[in-house]
């Protein structure tokens, strides 16, 4: 049957014509591709005259996303511009031909900031290029930036600020002032989108629907899933197991969630978004300290609901921020808090080290319900790397969850989402979820390609999915795992499964690092350097490299180790080795999933 259908999928070009077309298109910028698509379509139709002035005024919407929010906003902007009959292309920053950025005319960037001031994974190559000596003069570009961030971090929305200042330094003109938005960004985003469309309508020629230019290659695929972040699917927890030992300092759980009937599909490398609920015990403690009962009616999303329900399902309670501390200082007029207001560094440090509950416990005050909700940030879903492949587990999603747990003033505090999943959610109970696709962390298209997987702690999760997929599809490519954790006997996550993969030959090599099993701490980056020559040979043979772990610690150290081993065994200086790794990233041979 496959052979009968195959001819329908073949292009109406000879092999020679197809080669020539691919050769030409590979050298074109996104702007040139957009113009060419309109030109060729017009040549084929012979009926609708194309406005060459309009075709050269293509707007590029660039999405630089880490968790999906920037991508969703970029898609919304793209659809707004299409509706306004403007010529527009939308591109994932990881696919963007950034060395031809000088050919852009109208550039709109929606970017997030990863962790404490890093660019999102898909924008690293673009970011490094713009801040390098190779960056071109950009006098012909008009641009606008929307920066997403989280004010609980020191470098709030830093990458949006960096792109904005650097483009201006290179000669580009601001079309509209940069917008920096916190986690509750939607209202600001709606205003920004309207203003951008209004401005561009006054500057550019509109075209009818048939003349609108589009780019098929490098376009973001607009996925219309039945269930989304805004409209999640109600799944059910079917299995929950602790996979660290009783003596481990870590509490890590393996979860299996049933998504039967949802129609949700995912690939290894994707994440599961989880809408969690806050701890009722924590809510009761907060209400008592603030002199509230929880029965007071409050308005949330245009509905009147009890305050207790609002705190359980709609507001963030476990993460404090500098803005919350500042607002609480003004409400309480407490001298110690007011002293922090003018010292941004101390303010952020206090917020980082003092959860909201502990702040109000030390400095209690009676609040009206509306005052309390004005202080708090909206609850946002947590994303967890999926630890399974649908090719093996079908209508299930597996997660590997580490419980955030610490002590303050003699009391145990836990993370909102991790404690919900590990402690409060019971087997067979409902849980609201959605799939967050991550096209920047994908197995090679060629199943014969070797892969190198580097993870620490729960960073092993996506690699479990990778191996399930490779086994289910009988992929022939070699597989090498580097894994690190604290103790061999306590923290070897999914040990039996890795041993089975070694035994059946699917996993060709495994190197582990147990940081606290000896006097001198050993980490995965140390193992990489020990295996440097063999790793270099794998890379030379075309292997893809994957890293999953903490963005500010493990992932940075691993990248430094990779640059070092490339420099040593590739006989390069540091700058050449760093450029080599950047080229691997651009070619999708070096991919990271960091948190």
From Swiss-Prot:
Pfam families, per the entry: FAD_binding_1 (PF00667), Flavodoxin_1 (PF00258), NAD_binding_1 (PF00175)
Pathway: Sulfur metabolism; hydrogen sulfide biosynthesis; hydrogen sulfide from sulfite (NADPH route): step 1/1
Name of the protein described by the UniProt record: Sulfite reductase [NADPH] flavoprotein alpha-component
Binding site for FMN: 65-70, 112-115, 148-157
Sequence positions that bind NADP(+): 515-516, 521-525, 557
Cofactor note: Binds 1 FAD per subunit.
Amino-acid positions noted as binding FAD in the UniProt annotation, renumbered to this chain: 318, 352, 382-385, 400-402, 406, 415-418, 595
Protein source organism: Baumannia cicadellinicola subsp. Homalodisca coagulata
Family of this protein: Belongs to the NADPH-dependent sulphite reductase flavoprotein subunit CysJ family. In the N-terminal section; belongs to the flavodoxin family.
Job description of the protein: Component of the sulfite reductase complex that catalyzes the 6-electron reduction of sulfite to sulfide. This is one of several activities required for the biosynthesis of L-cysteine from sulfate. The flavoprotein component catalyzes the electron flow from NADPH -> FAD -> FMN to the hemoprotein component.
């Amino acid at each position: 049957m496959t052979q009968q259908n195959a001819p329908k999928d073949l292009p109406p070009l000879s092999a020679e014509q197809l080669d020539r077309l691919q050769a030409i298109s590979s050298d074109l910028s996104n702007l040139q591709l957009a113009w060419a698509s309109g030109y060729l379509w017009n040549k084929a139709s012979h009926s609708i005259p194309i406005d060459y002035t309009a075709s050269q005024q293509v707007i590029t919407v660039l999405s630089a996303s880490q968790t999906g929010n920037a991508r969703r906003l970029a898609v919304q902007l793209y659809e707004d511009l299409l509706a306004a009959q403007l010529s527009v292309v939308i591109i994932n920053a990881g696919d963007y031909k950034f060395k031809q950025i000088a050919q852009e005319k109208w550039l709109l960037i929606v970017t997030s900031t990863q962790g404490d001031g890093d660019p999102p994974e898909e924008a690293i190559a673009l970011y490094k290029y713009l801040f390098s000596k190779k960056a071109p003069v950009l006098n012909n570009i008009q641009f606008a930036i929307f920066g997403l961030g989280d004010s609980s971090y020191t470098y709030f929305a830093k990458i949006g600020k960096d792109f904005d200042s650097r483009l201006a330094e290179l000669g580009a003109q601001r079309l509209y002032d940069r917008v920096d938005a916190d986690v509750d960004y939607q209202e600001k985003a709606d205003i920004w989108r309207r203003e951008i469309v209004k401005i561009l309508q006054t500057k550019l020629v509109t075209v009818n629907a048939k003349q609108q230019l589009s780019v098929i290659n490098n376009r973001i695929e607009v996925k219309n899933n039945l269930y989304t972040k805004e409209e999640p699917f109600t799944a059910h927890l079917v299995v929950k197991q602790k996979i660290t030992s009783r003596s481990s300092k870590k509490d890590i759980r393996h979860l299996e969630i049933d998504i039967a009937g949802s129609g949700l599909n995912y690939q290894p490398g994707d994440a599961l978004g989880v809408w969690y609920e806050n701890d009722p015990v924590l809510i009761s403690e907060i209400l008592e300290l603030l002199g509230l009962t929880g029965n007071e009616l409050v308005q949330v999303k245009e509905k009147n609901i009890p305050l207790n329900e609002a705190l359980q399902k709609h507001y963030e309670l476990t993460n404090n921020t500098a803005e919350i501390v500042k607002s609480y200082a003004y409400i309480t007029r407490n001298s110690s808090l007011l002293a922090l207001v003018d010292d941004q560094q101390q303010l952020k440090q206090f917020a980082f080290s003092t959860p909201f509950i502990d702040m109000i416990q030390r400095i209690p005050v009676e609040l009206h319900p509306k005052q309390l909700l004005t202080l708090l940030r909206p609850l946002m879903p947590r994303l967890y790397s999926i630890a399974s492949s649908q090719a093996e587990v079908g209508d299930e999603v597996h997660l590997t969850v580490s419980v955030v747990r610490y002590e303050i003033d003699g009391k145990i505090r836990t993370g909102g989402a991790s404690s919900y999943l590990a402690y409060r959610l019971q087997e067979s109970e409902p849980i609201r979820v959605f799939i967050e696709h991550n096209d920047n962390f994908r197995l090679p298209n060629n199943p014969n390609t070797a892969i190198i997987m580097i993870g620490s702690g729960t960073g092993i999760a996506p690699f479990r999915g990778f191996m399930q997929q490779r086994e289910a599809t009988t992929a022939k490519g070699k597989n090498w795992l580097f894994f690190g954790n604290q103790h061999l006997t306590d923290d070897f996550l999914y040990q039996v499964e890795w041993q089975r993969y070694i035994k059946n030959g699917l996993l060709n090599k495994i190197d582990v690092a147990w940081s606290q099993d000896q006097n001198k701490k050993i980490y995965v980056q140390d193992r990489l350097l020990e295996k440097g020559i063999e790793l270099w040979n794998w890379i030379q043979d075309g292997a893809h490299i994957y890293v999953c772990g903490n963005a500010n610690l493990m992932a940075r150290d691993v990248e430094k180790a990779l640059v070092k081993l490339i420099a040593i065994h590739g006989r390069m200086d540091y700058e050449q080795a760093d450029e080599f790794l950047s080229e691997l990233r651009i070619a999708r041979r070096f991919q990271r999933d960091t948190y």
